[in-house]
Structures are given as structure tokens and as C-alpha cells.
Amino acid sequence: MVKAVAVLGSSEGVKGTIYFVQEGDGPTTVTGSITGLKPGLHGFHVHALGDTTNGCMSTGPHFNPAGKEHGAPEDENRHAGDLGNATAGEDGIVTVSVVDSQIPLSGPNSIIGRAVVVHADPDDLGKGGHELSKTTGNAGGRVACGIIGLQG
């Protein structure tokens, strides 16, 4: 079993901890919570780079080793890092629970050392017809991020 964690933070008061667990070659289970968000949907993605030297802006694009278009988590044609939306309640808290087979914690496409990013707006899952739909899901600014690191 491989475990990883990302501690999310931002200058906007959004924070959280996201845990990743993978058994063998099975799917990765993502759990955790995020606080300080405005109520509603927020794009939730794994980005390609674990670089936060310029805040969340330096985490690069969505993790996309297969060179596909942006999509929903259940779509065949999607970035590996497309995890859909996280829903914040009226209290601004998100409880994350995702199981996904495209974000392994080991092997050539491992997400260890990359970043998880929470966006300001809903991810349209590539179906919004906006010029950014097929690249970012038109999910808006990056309100919090954290580098995914191995956990003991």
C-alpha cells in the first residue's frame, strides 16, 4: 500500500488536508476536507507540477500524460488529473471522497510530487462550450493548492 498527503493552503484563508491511498495496482482513494471556500462547486484537479514558488500559479496545467482534452472524471477522454468538482456546503467546508484509476501513486505516471489544486469556480467538465472548457473546464482562479508527498 502506498500513501500520500497534500496540505492545502492559500493567502485567501482556504486550507485543508487531502489523503491519497493506493493498494497495489488498484485505483487511488482520495479523502480529506477543505475549509474556507465559498458555498457551491469548485474544480478539483491534480496539476502537473509540484512547484508553489509563485503560489498555485506555478503548478502548471492539469496532469495530462496521455495528451487528452479536459473532461469529467467518468469520461474516457479526460486529463488524468481531472477529478471533477468538490462541493462546499453553506459552512464553506468540502468533504472529499474520490476513487480514481488515473492518478497512481507509483509507476511512470505517479502523482507524487505533483500538486492538488482547488479552483474558485465550478468545473464545467469540458462540456460548457466556453473557450477554456476543453483545457481547464473554465474553473476559474486557483484558490488553494498543496504538493502531494509520500506518507509513511
From Swiss-Prot:
Record's subcellular location: Cytoplasm
A GO molecular function held by the record: superoxide dismutase activity
Binding site for Zn(2+): 62, 70, 79, 82
Cofactor-binding details, from the entry: Binds 1 copper ion per subunit. Binds 1 zinc ion per subunit.
Segments for region (Disordered): 61-87
EC number annotated for this UniProt entry: 1.15.1.1
Assigned keywords, A-Z: Antioxidant, Copper, Cytoplasm, Metal-binding, Oxidoreductase, Zinc
Biased composition (Basic and acidic residues): 67-81
List of residues binding Cu cation: 45, 47, 62, 119
Cofactor: Cu cation; Zn(2+)
Reported temperature dependence: Active between 10 and 60 degrees Celsius.
InterPro entries (alphabetical): SOD-like_Cu/Zn_dom_sf, SOD_Cu/Zn_/chaperone, SOD_Cu/Zn_BS, SOD_Cu_Zn_dom
Catalytic activity: 2 superoxide + 2 H(+) = H2O2 + O2
Pfam families given in the database record: Sod_Cu
pH dependence: Active between pH 5 and 10.
Any one GO cellular component localisation term in the record: cytoplasm
Primary role: Destroys radicals which are normally produced within the cells and which are toxic to biological systems.
Subunit structure: Homodimer.
Assigned protein family: Belongs to the Cu-Zn superoxide dismutase family.
Name of the protein in question: Superoxide dismutase [Cu-Zn]
Organism: Zingiber officinale (Ginger)
